[in-house]
Structures are given as C-alpha cells and as structure tokens.
Regions:
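Conserved beta-alpha
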Residues: 1-286
Length: 286
C-alpha cells in the first residue's frame, strides 16, 4: 500500500460479478482502498441462437473482410456457440479483426488469433471510427459485428456512412442478475476470496449500505440504469466514476454529474480517475 494514497480507507462499489471484479479489487487494495462487490447485471446468450450460429458459419467460411469485437463478451458468445456446434473457432486468413480495447485483444490472442486494429487513444466505438485507417480510406468492405442487445448504433451508423456492409447479429443479452443459468454466457466460477476490508454486497442491501461507500464505478450505461433502479437518489457524497464517455453520458442523462471519467477503460483507468478527482477536491473518508 502506498503510504500517501488518497484512497486509503475509502471504499468503491464495483457493480460486476466477483470474478470479473477481482483485478479491480486487487488494484484498489494496492492503493489502500477497499471494495464492495455487488453484481447487478448478468449476460445471457439469445434464447434463439439461429442467427448467431448462421453468422458464425459465415465467419468460419471466410465470408467477411473484418470481424469487429467490441467486448470480451462477444468473443465469449462466439466461443460458446462454436463449442456447442462442435466447431473450432478460428479466424480465416482472409478475415482481419478489429477490437475496441486491451481486454478484448488479450482474449483474442488467447485463441491464437491476431489483432489487426485497435484504437490507440480512445477505446470506444467513437475511437474506432476516428482511428481506423482502412475505414477512413473509404474502400468498401464486409463486416461481421456480433454485439449486445443494447449496443449503441455508433459503429453501425459509421459503417453505413462509409459504405461498408455491416452484418450485425445479437451475440448476448444484458439482463438483471442473476441471469438464467441455462443461457449463461460462461460457466459460473467460484467467487474469489476478497482481501480484508472488502466484501460482497447483495443487491437488496445496496440502499442501506450506500452511506458506507465513497465511490461507485460504472462500467457501462446498463450498470447506471440498474444501479439507479436500486438507488434512484444516490447520496451526494458518492463519487460517480464512469469508465468512458458513453457511460458518463448516461449518468448525465439521468440527472447525475460524474465525478470523473476514466481515460482508459481498465481497472487502473477507473481508479486513477477516482484518485485524481479526490486530489482535486479532497474529502475525508466516510
């Protein structure tokens, strides 16, 4: 723990399942902070996977110039369906792959696949459109983009404006936790042990626990909506930290001003944003 950490003895609320929150918990612990882990959303495969399965078959047949992956979950959905269909998920030699950020790139490399494009600066749909040289060159291409049921239209509209033929298919659904285990996007894993001071928080206990929290980390617009469904009027002392611009925009649309927005959509990005906001406007830990 850093002795001078402004985060010491403060607690951040993480709205993810414990396994996915583990890295953020570890990073907070290194800086002397604690975490309350409260899973509000879950991810399911579509009840009808025929469209996804057909898109997967076309991908494996080499029908697309590009595969666009905007989250680790989209890759998980492809892997799940490939396994269910007894297929090997591999990227054809003639298909290039674009990813939104480092987490998705790392998951892709675990498959032994390459990453042909990832934005350097803005790890978002907007950043992809701004930095994608082949897209900006204007030469038409075919794209497969599996995505969430609540994904924004940013990439779809960007492809259409540049004459690219985008085949968009729903790969997974975002639902309140817990989701249907029969449609689970991945096999549940045991919750990791949490360090001293950090704890699991059941969603129904969130309103009563809010006074003991110092910050909330929002990792998607849907986490904003599900949090506010449980706690419509967050206490004024809570620092609302957004993982990116679209999440910050959702907070503002709901009448709340983010205390900070992460420069990078990573655990360190969120924690750094929170820390910088505290240094700018110091408050005693609650």
């Amino acid at each position: 723990m850093r002795a001078d950490s402004v985060l010491a003895r403060r607690t951040a609320l993480l709205l993810r399942d414990p396994a996915r929150a583990a890295e953020t918990v570890a990073r907070l612990t290194e800086r002397g902070a604690c975490a309350a882990v409260c899973q509000l959303i879950d991810f399911e495969l579509p009840a009808d996977t025929r469209a996804l399965d057909a898109s997967l078959a076309r991908l494996l047949a080499g029908d697309f110039d590009w595969l666009v992956l905007t989250s680790v979950n989209t890759l998980r959905a492809l892997k799940h369906r490939a396994a269910a269909l007894n297929l090997r998920l591999m990227i054809p030699a003639g298909t290039q792959v674009a990813v939104v950020g480092e987490a998705t790139a790392a998951a892709l490399r675990e498959l032994g696949a390459r990453v042909d494009f990832m934005p350097r600066h803005d790890h978002s749909a907007r950043g992809m459109l701004a930095e994608w040289e082949q897209l900006r060159a204007g030469e038409p291409a075919s794209v497969l983009m599996p995505q969430a049921d609540i994904a924004s239209a940013t990439l779809r509209d960007g492809f259409a404006a540049r004459g690219w033929a985008a085949h968009i298919v729903i790969a997974y659904r975002t639902v309140p936790a817990p989701g249907n285990p029969h449609l689970a996007l991945q096999t549940p894993v045991a919750a990791p042990d949490l360090p001293a001071g950090s704890y699991l928080l059941e969603p129904e206990h969130l309103p009563g626990a809010s006074g003991r929290l110092d910050a909330v980390f929002f990792t998607s617009p849907s986490t904003v909506d599900n949090f506010l469904a449980r706690l419509p009027a967050p206490p004024a002392h809570l620092a609302l930290v957004a993982i990116g611009d679209s999440t910050a925009a959702r907070l503002r649309a709901r009448g709340l001003e983010p205390a900070a927005t992460a420069l990078f959509p990573t655990p360190d990005g969120l924690i750094n944003a929170w820390e910088q906001s505290l240094r700018a406007d110091l408050h005693p830990p609650r």
